[in-house]
């Protein structure tokens, strides 16, 4: 049994065993467990397991273990559960326990009452896009490599025909994700809203207006102008699939079982398909145009001030899980402007974390527990994966989290002051974002990164530590 498999067993032991887990999923850094009985979870024990970088209590219990490790840990848990990743785990011990089920239903009802509509919306957005993040990263970096090679070709540094062919091939691979993002979004949105995923994918594909030409366009019913493929972007897709889920569920209730498989999907697609083309695409197009205009105005006019605010407050948004609201905004910015000028500023938040961690490493030489945590979390922090540093280092200590935010604010102010530094895709951050910087503004982005590193280091070195942190061999209070 390797180290990651052992970690999976230790985590399961702390949460009450596999019999106390109803469902297992994961994202880039977190194992997300749906717990049957929260009273059986030993949180102090869970947080002190070597390899656990943080624990977040939410609708699902989220255990931060870091990139790469999360795949191995989740795979071992799934192996022990006997089901596939994401499937509900059957439990022989409680299938007939009506009392436990009633208590669970009561907890879920109370939890739903506590959740605001905004929290529900944010969680839905997160659940739609989190599974797509690896594809965003892979396709984005491949597109970045193609862009760098194309710049060399344009500059005359490279002229070989095979390089031109390679650039074309890399762009085809990149567009396998980005060109059909509406379909992927529709598919995932259907899963989140409880509709048939395939139908959601079809609705997403409808927005691409396949087969429509300039000679025979579909007119916008509100303006009379021709609709443009992808108009309304993913905002329109999400709204349309949400309505699809309502229509499909209603039809399942009223259509006889004998013809349900034929009638329900046909009527659902016909109704929502027409509404998507003639209503959702124009309306969502208006919304997305306004949203993009506002964001570009805030960044363009606010400059240094806007950059500081975004860079400084992005980490608290990540901590609260509210940062996912920016995902559709990034995508709309890329669709309309060719780049998102918001992402490089937000990326400075992670750079401030890196600077803070380096300062803690230097200042807290006697705190081997803290230095061990930094050693494990810092390398991926440079690459833009900040959760291990947030939940494993700065947030438990308190004060360094604040100084890291200030460092991110300085980096954001620098990016905002330079201006027009955008990214052509989303997903990566930190150094990993460098190949995706638009219009060859690499130097400006590097200056911003270095500024955030330095500011995070200075703020934390002078104001972010206490005597206890420096001398005691522990992490947090």
Swiss-Prot record:
Family annotation (PROSITE patterns): PTS_EIIB_TYPE_1 (PS51098), PTS_EIIB_TYPE_1_CYS (PS01035), PTS_EIIC_TYPE_1 (PS51103)
Region annotation (Disordered) ranges: 91-113
Signal peptide region: none
TM ranges: 128-148, 167-187, 192-212, 227-247, 267-287, 298-318, 342-362, 377-397, 401-421, 443-463
UniProt catalytic activity: N-acetyl-beta-D-muramate-(1->4)-N-acetyl-D-glucosamine(out) + N(pros)-phospho-L-histidyl-[protein] = 6-phospho-N-acetyl-beta-D-muramate-(1->4)-N-acetyl-D-glucosamine(in) + L-histidyl-[protein]
Any Gene Ontology CC annotation: plasma membrane
GO biological process, one term: phosphoenolpyruvate-dependent sugar phosphotransferase system
InterPro entries per UniProt: Glu_permease_IIB, PTrfase_EIIB_Cys, PTS_EIIC, PTS_EIIC_1, PTS_IIB_1, PTS_Sugar-Specific_Components
PTS EIIB type-1 domain residues: 5-87
Domain notes: The EIIB domain is phosphorylated by phospho-EIIA on a cysteinyl or histidyl residue, depending on the transported sugar. Then, it transfers the phosphoryl group to the sugar substrate concomitantly with the sugar uptake processed by the EIIC domain. The EIIC domain forms the PTS system translocation channel and contains the specific substrate-binding site.
Function according to Swiss-Prot or TrEMBL: The phosphoenolpyruvate-dependent sugar phosphotransferase system (sugar PTS), a major carbohydrate active transport system, catalyzes the phosphorylation of incoming sugar substrates concomitantly with their translocation across the cell membrane. This system is involved in the uptake and phosphorylation of MurNAc-GlcNAc, the principle peptidoglycan turnover product of S.aureus, yielding cytoplasmic MurNAc 6P-GlcNAc.
PANTHER family membership: PHOSPHOTRANSFERASE SYSTEM TRANSPORT PROTEIN (PTHR30175), PTS SYSTEM N-ACETYLMURAMIC ACID-SPECIFIC EIIBC COMPONENT (PTHR30175:SF3)
Descriptive protein name: PTS system MurNAc-GlcNAc-specific EIIBC component
Gene source species: Staphylococcus haemolyticus (strain JCSC1435)
């Amino acid at each position: 049994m390797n180290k990651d498999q052992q970690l999976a067993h230790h985590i399961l032991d702390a949460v009450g065993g596999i019999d106390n887990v109803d469902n297992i999923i994961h994202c880039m850094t977190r194992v997300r467990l749906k717990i049957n009985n929260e009273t059986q979870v030993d949180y102090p024990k869970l947080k002190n397991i070597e390899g656990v970088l943080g624990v977040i209590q939410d609708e699902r219990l989220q255990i931060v273990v870091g990139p790469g490790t999360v795949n191995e840990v989740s795979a071992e848990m799934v192996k022990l559960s006997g089901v596939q990743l994401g499937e509900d785990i059957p439990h022989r011990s409680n299938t007939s326990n009506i009392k436990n089920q009633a208590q669970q239903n009561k907890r879920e009802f109370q939890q739903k009452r506590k959740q605001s509509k905004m929290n529900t919306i944010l969680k839905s957005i997160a659940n739609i896009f989190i599974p797509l993040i690896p594809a965003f990263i892979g396709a984005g970096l491949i597109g970045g490599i193609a862009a760098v090679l194309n710049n060399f070709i344009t500059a005359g540094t490279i002229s070989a025909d095979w390089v031109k062919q390679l650039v074309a091939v890399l762009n085809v691979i990149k567009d396998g994700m980005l060109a059909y993002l509406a379909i992927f979004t529709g598919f995932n949105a259907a899963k989140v809203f409880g509709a048939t995923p395939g139908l959601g994918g079809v609705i997403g594909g409808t927005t691409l207006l396949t087969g429509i030409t300039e000679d025979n366009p579909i007119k916008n019913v509100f303006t009379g102008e021709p609709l443009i493929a992808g108009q309304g972007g993913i905002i329109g897709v999400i709204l349309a699939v949400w309505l699809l889920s309502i229509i499909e569920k209603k039809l399942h209730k009223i259509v006889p079982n004998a013809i349900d498989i034929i009638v329900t999907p046909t009527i659902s697609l016909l109704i929502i398909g027409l509404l998507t083309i003639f209503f959702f695409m124009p309306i969502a197009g208006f919304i997305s145009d306004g949203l993009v205009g506002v964001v570009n105005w805030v960044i363009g006019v606010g400059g240094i001030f806007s950059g500081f605010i975004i860079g400084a407050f992005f980490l608290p948004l990540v901590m609260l899980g509210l940062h996912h609201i920016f995902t559709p905004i990034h995508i709309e910015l890329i669709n309309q402007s060719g780049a998102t000028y918001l992402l490089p500023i937000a990326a400075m938040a992670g750079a401030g974390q890196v600077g803070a961690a380096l300062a803690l490493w230097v200042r807290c030489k006697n705190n081997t527990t803290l230095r061990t945590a930094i050693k494990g979390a810092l390398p991926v922090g440079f690459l833009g994966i900040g959760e291990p540093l947030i939940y494993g280092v700065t947030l438990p200590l308190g004060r360094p989290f604040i100084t890291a935010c200030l460092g991110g604010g300085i980096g954001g102010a620098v990016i905002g002051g330079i201006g027009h530094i955008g990214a052509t895709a989303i997903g990566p951050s930190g150094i990993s974002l460098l190949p995706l910087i638009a219009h060859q503004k690499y130097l400006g982005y590097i200056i911003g990164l270095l500024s955030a590193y330095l500011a995070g280091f200075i703020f934390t070195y002078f104001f972010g530590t206490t005597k206890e942190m420096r001398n005691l061999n522990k992490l947090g209070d």
